[in-house]
């Protein structure tokens, strides 16, 4: 794994649940690729996860990835909680089914292809990559709602 990629991801939702969007900004050797999409009835957490999944899916070969997210849910889920969810058969400590297990499993599959370094940043404080991912996620929401950007 020699290729080094930065991946900035975000999710947005107008209502929770409600129309939502995800965004991902890939940066490789100074070249940027923007990805976004949305769903008519979803949650902010599902969109945060989808942004990370779609960004990693876009990589055609194993890479060194620095994935930057403003989602504590994604960050803690992948770095702290998932190991125990998997041991318990995708159940929480309270023996409840893990919410969004379908997406967590897809994310786990994508992460296993790469060497991912997870980085959390506070949202909406002007971090350039995070702000771009936020704009892309909101573009996804707007497209689902039929608003042209």
Curated annotation (Swiss-Prot):
Positions bound to Mg(2+) 2: 10, 134
Keyword Transcription regulation: no
Cofactors: Mg(2+)
Cell location: Cytoplasm
Cofactor note: Binds 1 Mg(2+) ion per subunit. May bind a second metal ion at a regulatory site, or after substrate binding.
Domain RNase H type-1: 1-142
Role, per record: Endonuclease that specifically degrades the RNA of RNA-DNA hybrids.
Swiss-Prot/TrEMBL catalytic activity: Endonucleolytic cleavage to 5'-phosphomonoester
Pfam families the UniProt entry points to: RNase_H
GO cellular component, one term: cytoplasm
Binding, Mg(2+) 1: 10, 48, 70
EC number of the protein: 3.1.26.4
Family per similarity comment: Belongs to the RNase H family.
Chief place of localization: cytoplasm
Annotated keywords: Cytoplasm, Endonuclease, Hydrolase, Magnesium, Metal-binding, Nuclease
Gene it is expressed from: rnhA
Taxonomic superkingdom: Bacteria
Positions of disulphide bridges: none
Signal peptide coordinates: none
NCBIfam families: PRK00203.1 (NF001236)
Protein name, as recorded: Ribonuclease H
A biological process term (GO) from this entry: DNA replication, removal of RNA primer
GO-annotated molecular function: magnesium ion binding; nucleic acid binding; RNA-DNA hybrid ribonuclease activity
Subunit text: Monomer.
């Amino acid at each position: 794994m020699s290729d080094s990629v930065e991946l900035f991801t975000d999710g947005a939702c107008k209502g929770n649940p409600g129309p939502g969007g995800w965004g991902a900004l890939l940066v490789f050797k100074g070249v940027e690729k923007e990805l976004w999409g949305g769903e008519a009835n979803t949650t902010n957490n599902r969109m945060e996860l989808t942004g990370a999944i779609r960004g990693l899916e876009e990589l055609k070969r194993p890479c060194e990835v620095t994935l930057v997210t403003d989602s504590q849910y994604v960050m803690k889920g992948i770095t702290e909680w998932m190991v125990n969810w998997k041991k318990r058969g995708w159940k929480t400590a309270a023996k409840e089914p893990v919410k969004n297990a379908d997406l967590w499993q897809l994310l786990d599959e994508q992460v296993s292809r790469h060497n991912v370094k997870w980085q959390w940043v506070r949202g909406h404080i002007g971090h350039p990559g995070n702000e771009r991912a936020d704009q892309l996620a909101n573009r996804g929401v707007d497209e689902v709602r039929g608003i042209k950007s």
